[in-house]
Structures are given as structure tokens and as C-alpha cells.
């Protein structure tokens, strides 16, 4: 993904670029720091670095089991490594998870200090850690007011504990969804891809979004077996409603103004579900679903302008 954003650097001028998120278990923090510094130079100071351990289901596919290995301590250590390497260009460090002796780099970022943000979904400890040490928290798939409040409150606790002003940090939420003038295809598409995310969502997050883990267990088991079509058949329609924002521009405006902003979030990240994504993931087509470009333009024209005003 870093290569993709590097390619986009010369074709953009204002948008900030970076993967959401980069995994510090699968990739060494010093390598991540060098990629971030290089992208920052290519973009003239527009690089984003959001790091995480990734979800446990993904790591298991790589044969890695993090249970019982103190992932929060790993995140804290990775943050220290990246902060030092980006600021000084060299590092000597002997930690529990990472060790370096005389390591240096010529890759230097434009932004100083370089902002480093933490990605987290389960919480609350990762949310608190972000408030304590990072420049922000990027969470994902928090749709209900309960889920949003839970995240924001834990983030604030961490900031308060460290004597930091949480309002000066970047609190963001990545929401999955689709936008269209006709809400029917948008809702159908969102259900398809929301079902795919079930296996990556911890039970606690499902419950905070009003989803009973037992109710969706059959669909999750089908996904684990690789039976996508059966999983989609077993996923109840309520999953699409609870785990996405889908419909007309007004539906998006309502979600942002009534829930996201009041909970304290100042940054929205959106993963739009387009025909290509539905076809590649589920092997189906949905009549009337706008393309990605059409959804982006509709969102910019109708939603961003309304919220900004």
C-alpha cells in the first residue's frame, strides 16, 4: 500500500496519504518509519502513519497467535521506536519486542515532529493508549452511539492520564457504506460487504453496535470455511443496518450530525462499497449501485457541503 500512495504523491497536491493501518507485527517499525518518511518527502509533508497490531483473525492466517503476548506493550514499544527513528534518523534500542544497534537511515520526513496515530477496534486499552501517547486514534466500524461513546470516553481517559488535551488530537472513525440517490442498491451493497467484516470484529464491538455475536456465528463460520455465498445467505439483514451507513445523502448527514460529531469525533474515514468491490468479493452485481467515483462526487457535493455549513 505504501507503494500505491507513493505513486499517487505526484498526482495529488492537498490530500493526505497513507495506509489505514500498517501492522507492526508483520512489518518492523523502523521499516514503517522509513516508508513514512519517504512518502512525506514525496508529498511535501502530507504523509499519514497509522499503526496497529492488526486483527487477530488476520494474524492467524499468517500463523501468528498474539493471545497472551501483551499486544498493548508491543504497541507502546513500536511507537517509541518509530518516534525516535523519525525524529533522529538513528536508533539504539533494546526492548522486549524490538532491538537495534547503530541503525540509521537517510530517509527524513518533512513534518517535524512527524504525527503518529494508533489504530484500534476492540478497546478500551488500545483507545486509552492512543490518548496517552499517540497523535490520534483511528478506530473502525463503530456505528452506534454506544460504540462511538465507548471509544471516545476511553480515548479521553488516556489523554487525561497523560495530562494531554484530547481535543487537539485526531479522533477518527472509519465507516463502511454506500451512498446513492436510491437507497435500495446502497443498502444491498452495504450488507454484502458488512458481512465480510464480521470475522474481523471482536465480540465486544459487535455487541456495542447492537449485534448479537451468537446470531451471526453461522455466517462467520461459513466465511471461515470459505463458503462466501452461504455466509451471505446466513447474514441477517440487520447486519447491514447495524454495521454500515447506507442510503441517501441525508442518511449520511444524519449519522454524522446526530451521532459522530456529538460523540467527539472530528474526522470521518469512509470505505465506499462500489460495484467492483461487490463483484470481486461476492461475485454478484447490484443494479443501480453507483461507481466509486460517482459515490465520491455525490458525497462531496451533498454530504460534505452540508456538514461543513
Residue spans for each PLM region:
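Active-site-adjacent structural elements that line small-molecule/cofactor binding pockets in enzymes
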Residues: 1-309
Amino acid at each position: 500500500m505504501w507503494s500505491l500512495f507513493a505513486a499517487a504523491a505526484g498526482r495529488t497536491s492537498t490530500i493526505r496519504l497513507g495506509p489505514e493501518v500498517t501492522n507492526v507485527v508483520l512489518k518492523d517499525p523502523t521499516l514503517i518509519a522509513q516508508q513514512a518518511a519517504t512518502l512525506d518527502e514525496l508529498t511535501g509533508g502530507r504523509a499519514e502513519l497509522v499503526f496497529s497490531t492488526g486483527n487477530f483473525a488476520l494474524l492467524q492466517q499468517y500463523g501468528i497467535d498474539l493471545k497472551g503476548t501483551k499486544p498493548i506493550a508491543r504497541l507502546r514499544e513500536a511507537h517509541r521506536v518509530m518516534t525516535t527513528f523519525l525524529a533522529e534518523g538513528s536508533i539504539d534500542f533494546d526492548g522486549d519486542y524490538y532491538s537495534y544497534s547503530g541503525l540509521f537511515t537517510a530517509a527524513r520526513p518533512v513534518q517535524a515532529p512527524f504525527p503518529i496515530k494508533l489504530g484500534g477496534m476492540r478497546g478500551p486499552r488500545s483507545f486509552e493508549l492512543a490518548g496517552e501517547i499517540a497523535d490520534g486514534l483511528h478506530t473502525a466500524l463503530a456505528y452506534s452511539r454506544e460504540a462511538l461513546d465507548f471509544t471516545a470516553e476511553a480515548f479521553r481517559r488516556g489523554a487525561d492520564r497523560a495530562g494531554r488535551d484530547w481535543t487537539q488530537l485526531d479522533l477518527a472513525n472509519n465507516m463502511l457504506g454506500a451512498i446513492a440517490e436510491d437507497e435500495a442498491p446502497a443498502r444491498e451493497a452495504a450488507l454484502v460487504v458488512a458481512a465480510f467484516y464480521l470475522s474481523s470484529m471482536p465480540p465486544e464491538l459487535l455487541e456495542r453496535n447492537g449485534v448479537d455475536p451468537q446470531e451471526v456465528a453461522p455466517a462467520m463460520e461459513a466465511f471461515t470455511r470459505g463458503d462466501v455465498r452461504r455466509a451471505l445467505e446466513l447474514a441477517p439483514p440487520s447486519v447491514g443496518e447495524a454495521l454500515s451507513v447506507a442510503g441517501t445523502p441525508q442518511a449520511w448527514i444524519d449519522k454524522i450530525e446526530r451521532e459522530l460529531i456529538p460523540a467527539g469525533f472530528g474526522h470521518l474515514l469512509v470505505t465506499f462499497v462500489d460495484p467492483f468491490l461487490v463483484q470481486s468479493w461476492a461475485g454478484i452485481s447490484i443494479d443501480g449501485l453507483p461507481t466509486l467515483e460517482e459515490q465520491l462526487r455525490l458525497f462531496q457535493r451533498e454530504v460534505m457541503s452540508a456538514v461543513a455549513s
